[in-house]
Curated annotation (Swiss-Prot):
UniProt name for this protein: Putative RING-H2 finger protein ATL50
Biological processes annotated in GO: protein ubiquitination
Entries under PROSITE patterns matching the protein: ZF_RING_2 (PS50089)
Residue stretches spanning the membrane: 35-55
Organism expressing this protein natively: Arabidopsis thaliana (Mouse-ear cress)
Protein localization: Membrane
Signal sequence residues: none
This protein's pathway: Protein modification; protein ubiquitination
Domain notes per entry: The RING-type zinc finger domain mediates binding to an E2 ubiquitin-conjugating enzyme.
GO-annotated molecular function: transferase activity; zinc ion binding
Catalytic activity: S-ubiquitinyl-[E2 ubiquitin-conjugating enzyme]-L-cysteine + [acceptor protein]-L-lysine = [E2 ubiquitin-conjugating enzyme]-L-cysteine + N(6)-ubiquitinyl-[acceptor protein]-L-lysine
Cellular component GO terms held in the UniProt record: membrane
Lineage: Eukaryota, Viridiplantae, Streptophyta, Embryophyta, Tracheophyta
Length: 210
């Protein structure tokens, strides 16, 4: 009977000892886990912030050569295009000296009847020419207009009202030339009305030298 009691006490002591050690281990694990979790969380946040700062610094210090070259190219192209448009605008709206306008050749419409079928009305006032009308002829394009119409037009414009040829681009700027411009009538045949005829501008000095 005594032996059984001793055995029971021994088993109970062992069980109590094991249970006590298990409870201590569990309590230790419960105490360590929150600390480890906190450290892991802090390290993750630190690594994330460091990576974000690294990317930001790399982005801010990236080479600007390509972007600067592209911007410079766009700026130069825009400036050149603006300059060309400004030049054309200035030429179109430039005023012509009155002395140059007065030097442009004059003719009477009756001398042109039957010779130029495209010359029937004034492109400025849109009125048809009559035999008594005095016209002024523009060089190069050979378009003619009423004297008062084209003179008023050229005071504020430097282009032909009909074809938009620019008189300034033709080198006809400033004051009138010292030589006199005359209208020469060229005919390929006899004096018949059906023969091909044309008009040209020439310098009176060249005519006299011939």
């Amino acid at each position: 009977m005594d032996q059984k009691s001793d055995s029971f006490l021994s088993v109970s002591s062992i069980s109590f000892s094991y249970s006590s050690s298990t409870d201590k281990d569990f309590d230790l694990i419960c105490m360590i886990s929150p600390i480890v979790l906190l450290y892991i969380t802090l390290l993750s946040i630190i690594f994330f912030v460091a990576a974000l700062i690294h990317l930001l610094v790399k982005f801010l210090h990236r080479p600007q050569t390509r972007l600067d070259d592209a911007y410079d190219g766009i700026t130069e192209s825009s400036t050149a295009l603006q300059g060309r448009y400004q030049t054309r605008f200035n030429l179109h709206d430039a005023e012509i000296d009155q002395s140059f306008i007065d030097a442009l050749p004059l003719l009477h419409y009756k001398t042109m009847i039957g010779l130029r079928h495209d010359l029937s009305d004034c492109a400025v006032c849109l009125r048809e020419f009559t035999a008594e009308d005095e016209l002024r002829l523009l060089p190069k394009c050979s378009h003619a207009f009423h004297v008062e119409c084209i003179d008023t037009w050229l005071l504020t414009n430097s282009t032909c009202p009909l074809c938009r040829d620019n008189l300034l681009l033709l080198g006809l700027t400033g004051t009138a030339s010292s030589s006199t411009i005359v209208l020469v009538h060229e005919s390929d045949g006899d004096n018949s009305q059906d023969s091909d005829s044309s008009f040209m501008l020439t310098d009176l000095d060249d005519v006299e030298s011939k």
